[in-house]
Amino acid sequence: MESFEGEGDSIQSPDNARGDDVQNTGEHIQDPGPGPSTGGASEGLVQNEPDSRDQQSRGQRRGDENRGWMQRIRRRRRRRAALSGHLLDMEDNVPPWFPPHDITPYVARNIRDAACQAVKHSHLQALSNLILDSGLDTQHLLCFVMAARQRLQDIRRGPLVVEGGVGWRHWLLTSPSRSWSMGYRTATLRTLTPVPNRVGADSIMLTATFGCQNGALAINTFSATVWIPPPAGPREQERYAREAEVRFLRGKWQRRFRRIFDLIELCGSLHHVWQNMLQTEENLLDFVRFMGVMSSCNSSSVNYWFHKTIGNFKPYYPWNAPPNENPYHARRGIKEQVIQKAFLKAQRQGLSMLATGGGPRGDATSETSSDEDTGRQGSDVELESSDDELPYIDPNMEPVQQRPVMFVSRVPVRKPRTLPWPTPKTHPVKRTIVKTSYRSDEAEEAQSTPERPGPSKQPSEPVEPAHTTPAGRSTVILHEPPREPEAVSFKPPPPPSRRRRGACVVYDDDIIEVIDVETTEEETTSMQRQPPLGQQPPPPVISTGSAMSSSHTDPSVTQPSKPHRKPQDGFQRSGRRQKRAMPPPVSPSDAGPPSTRPRVMAPPSTGPRVMATPSTGPRDMAPPSTGPRDMAPPSTGPRDMAPPSTGPRDMAPTVVHMFTRERLLTQSTGPAPRSFWEMRAGRDAPKIQQEPSSQQQPATQSTPPCQSWVPSVYVLPAVDAGNAQPLQISHLSSMSPTQPISHEEQPRYEDPDTPLDLSLHPDTATLPPTQDLYPGREDLQATQAPYPGYEEPRPPQAPFVGDYGFVQIPSAQWEPHPSQGTYQGHIDPQLPAALDLGPEQPRFPQDPYVYSGGQLSSCPGYAGPWPSRPQHPRYRHTLALWPREPRHGHSQGPWKPWSAHLPPQWDGSAGHGQDQVSQFPHLHSETGPPRLQLSSVPQVLYPQPLVSSSAPSWSSPQPRAPIRPIPTRFPPPPMPLQDSMAVGCDSSGTACPSMPFASDYSQGAFTPLDINAPTPKSPRVEESSHGPARCSQATSEAQEILSDNSEISVFPKDAKQTDYDASTESELD
């Protein structure tokens, strides 16, 4: 009762309970209502009333009148509730919703006039197109508008998520299949609510969601309430059949009569058409002929249309003017006899005249036709010929079932599907010609032997890596861009053995971390085969670019030399990766004068040395190869080749677990890198100890050349005071095992028990502190070396903010060390053997995108988790972090109702003004402000191809395309302009109502808000080197396959089409 009787039930009745005084109105006799009637109190009131009636003051009498009025109101409310099926004061009773204003039914003319006025306003163009192009009747137009309004309310209110999420379906309208038969488009429109005379109208935003078959998935929308037109009864079906027959007949008529048909249907007034809509005398005579045909027509369907359109059953002839008025045709200069003659002739010929034009069918030159008919036919032939050149739809044509071929650009031929991460192969691989390795780079020898020819120069289609190494050798695969083969003389290598060793792929873009290493005895012994001290060649001096200054060329700075590598150790890098992620290598002219160019020095026993001049720039002494795979950029420094007598260090393990993640940094900064095994050398320190004689090296050696471009990933610099052994980290672009790195790059692990590993760095050196690599970061010089769980900081120009805009802090697996400066004689110990990453830790799941633990940060080259979503997800607020994989009881995150209309707010993925990534992740104390540890959250919500292919159009701030007005020469609506109810049927009377939300009315009326929205032509579109595309700009070229811009309609099968609306004369003035 509360909801129906409202707030005013207790107005001015402080003494009476609700529902009393019912007896005074006599209501309890007719309809006492289920309300609690307090009979006793009201009876007492009735007994006292005759006595106190005269003593009542004026205010009491007014209160009594108000009470009687409220009783009347209550009775009306009760009856209304009973009629609507609601009984008051019942449990679980939800009263019906009543609109706040009176809704008066509209006639079609009001809406038509409003649509015609809306054409003038560009922001109302879509609504007018909806009304005028599809020709709905009033009921269905209102149904369309109410459905759009319902969807607007749903968006503003948000999903009513009940337990289990069954209350409101959150439809993400994407599909992994390439051809999905249903697409949705939205059009947003600012209008006023339809109230009479715009009194009290509210400005609302209409967002209509329309479906079109075979339409592109233009935008991710939430579904409006699926509105189904009311089923047509038998009378409606008769009416639809009549309308369809009239449209079919109209399609056969000549164009001039079709135009009069449409004018009469549009205006509904014969006088208006006669006096205002016909320009020439020939048009007036055509109107007279049309009226003659209508007056004698015996087709019930045409009669029904005509009388329904003009509004009465007695057609009047507008040329019969009232007697005191000069008729309109006389003012136009047409005689009465001409009009009567044309009218009678059309009456005799009937409906066939509208199709043939009045003349005999096969005889265009007959003399029997009148003069006006002859002239009319000549011009009509011209019009029809020009009409045929316009696009039209034949009434008997098959309906379009797919997009026309002209709009379908060819989907590029798919390459063989491969995994987007380098796959380790720990078994022998026979070389095949099948190009299946799509992302893992060619891991073949730099030497292409006659029995194993090198791959062809096809960077776009890399071949399956065939790892063939000598028996004692491991392959450290470092990727370089293609280089020209060099003419160097060297003895051919021993025959390669087919044993595939674990390879560490280290390059600019990806860091592959070796987790499990099982070193065998043979590898340990081969690692100890170092060249004696006398064979260590003095590395040449190079002065590099502006980032590194002459501090690297200080002769006192020595560099622990590495044993030389055979040419078939196969350092190579894919040209694709180099092209994409690396700055172009410095040309020989940029690297400095010819005296400071890198010189390749071989040991004395090698034989002839090759000096790399600036013009030739050979990287190493290697036999000429057929492919460009083994050459490094000239800026990365030399590679020293050893004679085959000096056995190579075999550091490759047998079991290698690799993990790749895409580099998020844009440019590389810092000096030259080394292989991963020298970086991880501290593991084998107790096993491989060198004799102390080879651990020292003459300090006269000068530093080998560094790269002239700065490294892409660097570690925290540490001041090397004393004779600490610098552990050379492999910088991600290095090709050479003998490259030095500046000591900004030397990670040193502090553990008091483990001695320094000198086996891999046989020469000690005292490195004076060089100048800072990055100006303005002097504080980094004094910080400690990273602890094992440390993740490397990013350069300040590209901070890595975590997946959703949170700074990645080191995993809680390792305790952060307190920060303190290094004292003078401080020696940083190596990684302890206790922290050896054994085969049981960490275990990675099969999916390399998903890892739930924080163990990855224990690897030195780790640079943060792989971001599992596109860089601009749609809902960026902090609580919408969906779990990366659906769990039990997974419910959707909270709803942000304004995100549907507002541009997204970028938190930290764009890298503009957010907080920078902390350069000292190990300085975060445990008591600091709590940060979200995203590394422990599983990282994929949906499969990756779905996320990449359905990147929402909000993911990048692209300009929204305005809603285009529709050209007039559009294919016609499939229904009559007045009463179609979106139902197509043939003349036999069977109706096939097409659901408007699956219909094609939106084809002309609306265009997608975002023309650049991606279309999932395949599950995975245009990926970068690993995983889905990072930005919508990268995919926008490849995804403009099926756009929704084409003005092609899909019509119901049996709708009879005409070509009137495609004409040039279709504007009605």
UniProtKB/Swiss-Prot annotation:
Biased composition (Polar residues): 543-561, 1032-1048
GO biological process, one term: symbiont-mediated perturbation of host cell cycle G1/S transition checkpoint
Species annotation: Epstein-Barr virus (strain AG876) (HHV-4)
Source taxon at top rank: Viruses
Similarity-based family: Belongs to the herpesviridae EBNA-6 family.
Ranges of compositional bias, category Basic and acidic residues: 50-67, 742-751
Pfam family, one: EBV-NA3
UniProt keyword Membrane, yes or no: no
Gene name linked to the record: EBNA6
Function: Plays an essential role for the activation and immortalization of human B-cells. Represses transcription of viral promoters TP1 and Cp through interaction with host RBPJ, and inhibits EBNA2-mediated activation of these promoters. Targets host chromatin through interactions with host transcription factors, especially RBPJ and IRF4. Alternatively, EBNA6 also regulates the transcription of the EBV oncogene LMP1 in a cell cycle-dependent manner.
Subcellular location: Host nucleus; Host nucleus matrix
Protein name: Epstein-Barr nuclear antigen 6
Major location (coarse): host cell
Chain intervals with Acidic residues compositional bias: 381-391, 507-524
Subunit structure, as described in the record: Interacts with host CTPB1; this interaction leads to gene repression, but also seems to interfere with the repressive function of CtBP pre-bound to DNA, leading to EBNA6 mediated up-regulation of many host genes. Interacts with host MYC; this interaction enhances MYC stability. Interacts (via N-terminus) with host RBPJ. Interacts (via N-terminus) with host histone H2AX; this interaction facilitates H2AX proteasomal degradation. Interacts with host TP73; this interaction inhibits TP73-mediated apoptotic pathway.
Keyword tags: G1/S host cell cycle checkpoint dysregulation by virus, Host nucleus, Host-virus interaction, Modulation of host cell apoptosis by virus, Modulation of host cell cycle by virus, Repeat, Transcription, Transcription regulation, Viral latency, Viral latency initiation and maintenance
